Regions:
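Sec/Tat signal peptide C-region and signal peptidase I cleavage site
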Residues: 8-13
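Sec-dependent N-terminal signal peptides
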Residues: 1-7
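Subset of outer-membrane beta-barrel
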Residues: 14-408
Length: 408
């Protein structure tokens, strides 16, 4: 049976064309539930998906929940919508709801709900006969707690529940399938320091952050199989710098790198005469280069830094990077741009992003637009929209120093 749903979820994380790129073999890392990797909000989406070290906002939950305690307001909520992969089909959608509440000036709680609908999928059997139409979907719910350690540094922990229903209970190889369930967590840190710039006394802010996301159990879609897939455990590192030229004009620039912390597929030994993979006495495929990917989650995280069959050169190709700019006028009007790069042998996502936003009082509306370097890429012309409500509190001054740990 052709599980079209599985193909759709992989499509936005891969763009596989020829078998090699400039003599380098394609070796894309695949995981379950790749929808967790998609930047859902318009602000980040307009800056090359960069967000781990930008200023705090309502949508920090996806990028770096540690930022929430640096929000100037007390409570905020936002909803984001993106029609996804419109170059392929017209009914795949991503919805994202996020919110935060600053308990004190040193503590914050946060929440997000991410829902990914794959639209109508026509299932067929191994002979191509229709087996009905279903609407596969996935969602993730998470709660976060962030805490300032000192005035400039914060940390956060974010547990997550993941539900992935791709097969809608269809029978595959005479075996019933079920929805995949998983639990995961993010661990993050954020640094923010204000200072005067030179003799001009212009205000500026340096920010840095990291986030290790989706640390959790492997996921399976059948109770009768031993095969389980890794979650997209990912490491993000970033830094940004903002300058307030005066009370009206601010410019922020940043750079971010990220890497999947899951095993890289090895290169197996192939028989030259038959073209088939060779197996050992225990009926395991013989690895020619690289390492065995069938390991625990913890081992997979550490192994991911030195298991690529192409050695150090391939490890560096597994690092994606993005750059972004944001200009704001009186924190009212925003213009943004960015660029994201993923090596052609590792998925080939390369795109330019632009966007704009308007924020007035408690309301904010942002949008982002994506241009891909490859005009035939399924991500081409992707749009994102975000509506934000960010509230100051009448009791803001009352909580300003609550929660602070007194140091002797």
């Amino acid at each position: 049976m052709l599980l079209a749903a599985l193909g759709c979820t992989a499509a936005y994380s891969q763009a596989i064309g020829d078998h090699n790129y400039l003599g380098q073999e394609l070796n894309t890392i695949t995981t379950a539930v790749p929808f967790l990797q998609v930047a859902p909000d318009s602000r980040s989406g307009a800056m090359g998906d960069m967000g781990v070290a930008t200023s705090a906002d309502v949508n920090s939950q996806h990028h770096n929940p540690s930022k929430y305690v640096f929000n100037k307001n007390i409570f905020g909520v936002s909803i984001s919508y993106s029609p996804w992969l419109r170059k392929l089909v017209n009914d795949i959608n991503l919805l994202y709801l996020s919110a935060y509440w600053k308990i004190t000036d040193y503590d914050a709680l946060s929440f997000s709900l991410r829902y990914f609908s794959l639209g109508d999928i026509q299932f067929t059997d191994m002979y191509g006969q229709p087996m009905g139409t279903q609407k596969p979907n996935e969602f993730a719910i998470d709660l976060g707690y962030s805490r300032k350690l000192i005035d400039q540094l914060s940390i956060a922990i974010t547990p997550r529940f993941i539900y992935s229903n791709l097969t809608a209970g269809q029978i595959v190889d005479n075996e019933p399938t079920n929805a995949g369930l998983a639990g995961a967590a993010d661990v993050s840190m954020f640094y923010e320091q204000d200072f005067a710039l030179g003799k001009s006394n212009m205000n500026s802010t340096l920010r840095a952050g990291f986030n290790i996301s989706n640390i959790g159990n492997k996921i399976s879609y059948s109770s009768g199989t031993l095969h389980r897939d890794f979650l997209p455990t990912n490491l993000k590192l970033g830094v940004s710098y903002a300058i307030d030229f005066n009370e009206h004009h601010t410019l922020m620039a940043g750079v971010e790198i990220n890497k999947l912390l899951v095993p890289t597929p090895p290169e197996y030994l192939v028989n030259d005469s038959t073209g088939r993979i060779e197996y050992d006495a225990a009926n395991n495929p013989i690895i020619k280069y690289g390492k065995n990917p069938d390991v625990s989650v913890a081992q997979g995280i550490f192994q991911s830094f030195n298991d690529a069959p192409g050695g150090a050169a391939e490890e560096f190709r597994e690092v994606n990077w993005s750059v972004g700019l944001e200009y704001s006028y009186r924190n009212l009007l925003f213009v943004r741009a960015g660029y994201f790069f993923e090596h052609p042998t590792k998925g080939n996502r390369q795109f330019i992003t632009v966007g704009a936003g308007i924020h007035y009082s408690i309301f904010g509306l942002d949008m982002a637009y994506l241009f891909t370097v490859d005009q035939h890429h399924p991500l081409e012309n992707t749009l994102r929209f975000t509506l934000t409500f960010d509230f100051a509190s009448f009791k803001k001054d009352d909580i300003r120093n609550q929660g602070k740990v007194q140091m002797n």
